[in-house]
From Swiss-Prot:
Binding sites annotated in the UniProt record for substrate: 8-15, 21-22, 60, 86-89, 97, 113-114, 182-183
Feature type site, description Transition state stabilizer: 181
Signal peptide: none
UniProt name for this protein: 2,3-bisphosphoglycerate-dependent phosphoglycerate mutase
Superkingdom of origin organism: Bacteria
Similarity comment: family membership: Belongs to the phosphoglycerate mutase family. BPG-dependent PGAM subfamily.
Oligomer status and interactors: Homodimer.
Enzyme class label: isomerase
Keyword Nucleotide-binding in annotation: no
Function summary: Catalyzes the interconversion of 2-phosphoglycerate and 3-phosphoglycerate.
GO molecular function: phosphoglycerate mutase activity
PANTHER family, alphabetized: PHOSPHOGLYCERATE MUTASE
C-alpha cells in the first residue's frame, strides 16, 4: 500500500480578501498558518513515513509545507515545481471576486472559475502581477509561462509533471506529500478519481486539510479520506 497526501495551502491573504490569486505570490494569514500546523499534526498521527515532499513555486504552498515538515521534525529539502502552481487567472488576477460578479455578471465569473475549458482574458505582460515580472519565475523558460489558463490547461500542466516525476515513485512504494493549490489538486483528483470534465468542476478543495489517498500496486485507489473530518468536502467519488 502506497500513500499519497494532497494538501491545499492554508488560507492565504488573498483568499481572505476574496481576490483572484493565480500565480501571484501571497503569504498565509494567521488562520492559514494555524491550518498548516494542524495539517502537520493530522499527518503526524497517521504515522506514515513520507519519502518525498513536493510543493509549487508559490510562497503559500511552500510555507504550508514548511509548517507541516516542522511538525513532523523533517528537515529534508522539498522539491519545488512550478508545474504544481495554481491556475493562472489571466486578466482577473488581483481583482475582487464579488466586485467582478457585479461588473461582469455571476454567470460569466462562474464560467471563468468553474468551467473545464473556458479561460479569462490574458493578463497584459506589462502588468506587475504577470509571472514574467515576478522574480521567482525568472528561472522558467518564457514559453512555459502562461498569460491565462483554463482548468484544462492547468490539468495538462500538472499531469505531465505527475506522470514524469511522481507516478513512478508511487509505483515503487514511495509515500509522497504534495502541498499545492485548489486547481492543481483538482487536476490531480480528476486523474486519480477518474472524474469527468463536468464532475471535476464541482469538486471543492478545503484549505489546509490533508487528503490521504491509499493506492494499491496498480495505482488504484483503495481508500481516501480527509484527515480533518470536521472540515471535509464531498470527494464526489463514491
Amino acid at each position: 500500500m502506497t500513500h499519497l497526501i494532497l494538501v491545499r495551502h492554508g488560507q492565504s491573504e488573498w483568499n481572505l480578501e476574496k481576490r483572484f490569486t493565480g500565480w501571484v505570490d501571497v503569504d498565509l494569514t494567521g488562520q492559514g498558518k494555524l491550518e498548516a500546523c494542524k495539517a502537520g499534526e493530522y499527518i503526524k498521527e497517521t504515522k506514515i513515513d513520507i519519502d518525498y515532499f513536493y510543493s509549487s513555486f508559490q510562497l503559500r504552498a511552500i510555507n504550508t509545507l514548511k509548517f507541516i515538515q516542522d511538525t513532523l521534525r523533517d528537515k529534508r529539502e522539498p522539491v519545488k515545481a512550478w508545474q504544481l502552481n495554481e491556475r493562472h487567472y489571466g486578466a482577473l488576477t488581483g481583482l475582487n471576486k464579488d466586485e467582478m460578479k457585479e461588473k461582469l455578471g455571476e454567470d460569466k465569473i462562474h464560467a471563468f472559475r468553474r468551467s473545464w475549458d473556458i479561460k479569462p482574458d490574458p493578463l497584459n505582460r506589462n502588468n506587475p502581477y504577470h509571472p514574467l515580472n515576478i522574480e521567482v519565475y525568472k528561472s522558467i523558460p518564457k514559453e512555459n509561462i502562461p498569460d491565462t489558463e483554463s482548468l484544462k490547461d492547468t490539468y495538462d500542466r500538472v499531469m505531465k509533471f505527475y506522470i514524469d516525476e511522481i507516478q513512478m515513485k508511487l509505483k515503487n512504494d514511495k509515500n509522497i506529500l504534495i502541498s499545492a493549490h485548489g486547481n492543481s489538486i483538482r487536476a490531480l483528483c480528476k486523474f486519480l478519481f477518474k472524474l469527468d470534465n463536468q464532475r471535476i468542476t464541482l469538486l471543492e478543495i478545503p484549505t489546509g486539510n490533508p487528503l490521504l489517498i491509499n493506492l494499491d500496486s496498480k495505482q488504484n485507489i483503495k481508500e481516501c479520506t480527509y484527515l480533518d473530518q470536521d472540515r471535509a468536502k464531498d470527494l464526489l467519488v463514491f
